[in-house]
Curated annotation (Swiss-Prot):
A GO CC term attached to the entry: mitochondrion
Cofactor(s) annotated in UniProt: Mg(2+); Zn(2+)
Species name: Brachypodium distachyon (Purple false brome)
Reactions catalysed according to its record: RNA(n) + a ribonucleoside 5'-triphosphate = RNA(n+1) + diphosphate
Any one biological process term the GO annotation gives: DNA-templated transcription
Enzyme Commission number(s) from the entry: 2.7.7.6
Name of the protein in its database record: DNA-directed RNA polymerase subunit beta'
Residues that, per the record, bind Zn(2+): 69, 71, 87, 90
InterPro entries referenced in this protein's UniProt entry, alphabetically: DNA-dir_RpoC_beta_prime, RNA_pol_asu, RNA_pol_N, RNA_pol_Rpb1_1, RNA_pol_Rpb1_3_sf, RNA_pol_Rpb1_clamp_domain, RNApol_RpoC1
Keywords: Chloroplast, DNA-directed RNA polymerase, Magnesium, Metal-binding, Nucleotidyltransferase, Plastid, Transcription, Transferase, Zinc
Protein family membership: Belongs to the RNA polymerase beta' chain family. RpoC1 subfamily.
């Protein structure tokens, strides 16, 4: 039905009992109205046909076979008469069997039942509207206590109780037998309310506009009081103010959506279409059924028992009726949410029943798995890995995924460039992986963005556009800076890749969804492309250095190699294993690293530009060395100053590692590139 009417959204909310009936009711030509499920049976054990008025009734939900009724008759071709839409014998409609996927039924409850989502949810909507504690409402719903119903302004037995305490105490011997007489039932129904019916009465008496006005007045009074200095009282006042705001918002929402508060208490229980809760027969007379069918059976049995007791109310004890009402409430709670009463309900094999909430919610629920997570054409899926050589707006696609996604475009270009004569030969060239295929594939990918998505897509940065490039292997390569927007890491996460086909979709991807255009969080405005997880660990390892300090070279007895010397001479740079090497440029240090003479965390001395901050520092040198020609070396914790005999500074050497040098070069190149780009814009 969603495809038929082209609905763009789906919303879950409250509906009226009249709407539930309209979903299910069908009028037969003889005037009979069908739609109510009254029996807990499913299929007849001999004929394997659905039971009448049961959970799989063909009269209520439609035929199992298209155009064939329960009698085996079929509708005459071309018959458009209204009377011929239904079988005159069994009452089954001659319709397509797919109607059993959306035709609903209903159960008429013998007593009102609260909807567990609105009673026990956080926050409790019923408790918020009634401004009563949830514990008291639960006790009222499950029959733990009752309250006096203000049904009339005349004096009643319960109202006069406080005026005649002494007289009542003296008449206890005559009052007690009254509760066991049939007259007590009339008295109870008139003056005492309990169960979900009491909640429904209170909700029906609410005036939402008055609730908003009174809550606003109380909130202003609390705001004018200010702080009292008592921490406990101030905390209670803050909690009350938050509650009043939430109550006003809830009442306003009910008014705007034209929803009545008493609809949170059910009088009619909808029954799902049978195709959404199937029964499957397997070999060996084994039957596999949905748990929802068993939960519906429990509701119908208990509801029928309660209806029977209410018909014989003059013979049934009041306590038995209240107990049966509680059982109906618990059965409906289990159907809607199995774990609402603490421990979930289990079957005879100690297996937890899967309720409607369990079917809907979670990663394997109806929405995320079936509706949002279903497979579509022109899409693929694979594990993500780091792509160190990629730009921020690029992603690496494996050859297998790329050729599958862009196969139609490659075939079109092969035929256009007269490399093949028809589609069949083009597919064979692709299957044989000829070189021209990869050339055309790269040309096609150069002008076509792709979309990467990681479930769950909780905000708009969960799906972004990238420029694809071909990579070896079977994994999708990704720049690590975009991981925070996806909430992804490289420990086995998978991502889906989609191909935008229309020109509008490609334009939207380029203008709005490219990763280098989504650098800030849309929620709070903070940078979203920041180093996280793997990048932070890599930067830490790159810049960790040698924690043993400058004195490790002199006093380290196990780290020196006095008998092994390796010289590295390049532009007056000297490296020996028995002391920390000295380099006159970062290029020399990188050359030594490529020749495996030093490692990333090996301490070294690097000649640096004259820095006035280092020269003017008040740090005391660790050691000062003088040479015969008058030159001297002032050794500090992280740098070395070389001066001449005239006390002039000739050069400065900093003590660093190759990891620090590489990190500094990357930052310097990035800053220079940004400065050049900024100067061009000016």
């Amino acid at each position: 039905m969603i495809d038929q009417y082209k609905h763009q959204q789906l919303q879950i909310g409250l509906v009226s009992p009249q709407q539930i009936k309209a979903w299910a009711n069908k009028n037969l030509p003889n005037g009979e109205v069908i739609g109510q499920v009254t029996r807990p049976s499913t299929f007849h054990y001999k004929t394997d046909k659905p039971e009448k008025d049961g959970l799989f009734c063909e009269r209520i939900f439609g035929p199992i076979k298209s155009g064939i009724c329960a009698c085996g008759n079929s509708r005459a071709s071309g018959a458009e008469n209204e009377d011929e839409r239904f079988c005159q014998k069994c009452g089954v409609e001659f319709a397509d069997s797919r109607i059993r996927r959306y035709q609903m039924g209903y159960i008429k409850l013998a007593c009102p039942v609260t909807h567990v989502w609105y009673l026990k949810g956080l926050p409790s909507y019923i408790a918020n509207l009634l401004d009563k504690p949830l514990k008291k409402l639960e006790g009222l719903v499950y029959g733990d206590f009752s309250f006096a119903r203000p049904s009339t302004k005349k004096p009643t037995f319960l109202r006069l109780r406080g005026l005649f305490e002494e007289e009542i105490a003296s008449c206890n011997h005559s009052i007690s037998p009254f509760f066991s007489t049939p007259s007590f039932t009339t008295f109870r129904n008139r003056e005492i309310a309990t169960g979900a019916g009491a909640i429904r009465e209170q909700l029906a008496d609410l005036d939402l506009q008055i609730i908003i006005e009174n809550s606003l007045v109380e909130w202003k009074e609390l705001e004018d009081e200010g702080y009292s200095g008592d921490e406990w009282e101030d905390r209670k006042r803050r909690i009350r103010k938050v509650f009043l705001i939430r109550r006003m918002q809830l009442a306003k929402h009910f008014i705007q959506t034209n929803v009545e508060p008493e609809w949170m208490v059910l009088c009619l229980l909808p029954v799902l279409p049978p195709e959404l809760r199937p029964i499957v027969y397997r070999s060996g007379d084994k039957v596999v059924t949905s748990d929802i069918n068993e939960l519906y059976k429990r509701v119908i049995r208990r509801n029928n028992n309660l209806a029977y007791l209410l018909k014989r109310s003059e013979l049934a004890p009041a306590d038995l009726v209240m107990c049966q009402e509680k059982l109906v409430q618990e059965a409906v709670d289990t159907l809607l949410d199995s774990g609402s009463r603490g421990q979930p309900t289990r079957d005879g094999h100690n297996k937890v029943y899967k309720s409607l909430s369990d079917v809907i919610e979670g990663k394997e629920g109806r929405f995320r798995e079936t509706l949002l997570g279903k497979r579509v054409d022109y899409s693929g899926r694979s594990v993500i890995v780091v792509g160190p050589s990629l730009s921020l707006h690029q992603c690496g696609l494996p050859l297998e995924i790329a050729i599958k996604l862009f196969q139609l475009f490659v075939i079109r270009d092969l035929i256009t460039k007269r490399a093949t004569s028809n589609v069949r030969i083009a597919k064979r060239k692709i299957w044989e992986k000829e070189p021209i295929v990869w050339e055309i594939l790269q040309e096609v990918m150069r002008g076509h963005p792709v979309l990467l998505n990681r479930a769950p897509t909780l905000h708009r940065l969960g799906i972004q556009a990238f420029q694809p490039t071909l990579v070896e292997g079977r994994t999708i390569s990704l720049h690590p800076l975009v991981c925070k927007g996806f909430n992804a890491d490289f420990d086995g996460d998978q991502m889906a890749v989609h191909l935008p086909l229309s020109l509008e979709a490609q334009a939207e991807a380029r203008l709005l969804m490219f990763s280098h255009m989504n650098l800030l969080s849309p929620a709070i405005g903070d940078p979203i492309c920041v180093p996280t997880q793997d990048m932070l660990i890599g930067l830490y390892v790159l810049t960790i250095g040698n924690p043993r300090g400058i004195c490790a070279n002199r006093y380290n007895s196990c780290g020196n190699y006095p008998n092994q010397k390796v010289n590295y001479n390049n532009n007056n740079s000297t490296y020996t294993r028995d002391k920390e090497p000295i380099f006159y440029s970062s290029y020399d240090a990188l050359g030594a690293y490529r020749q495996k003479l030093i490692s990333l965390d090996s301490p070294l001395w690097l000649r640096w530009k004259l820095d006035q901050r280092a020269i003017g520092s008040r740090e005391v040198p660790i050691e000062v060395q003088y040479e015969s020609l008058g030159t001297y070396h002032e050794i500090y914790a992280h740098y070395l100053i070389v001066g001449n005999r005239k006390k002039e500074i000739c050069s400065i050497y900093i003590r660093t590692t190759l990891g620090h040098i590489s990190f500094y070069r990357e930052i310097e190149e990035a800053v220079q590139g940004f400065s050049q780009a900024y100067s061009y814009t000016i």
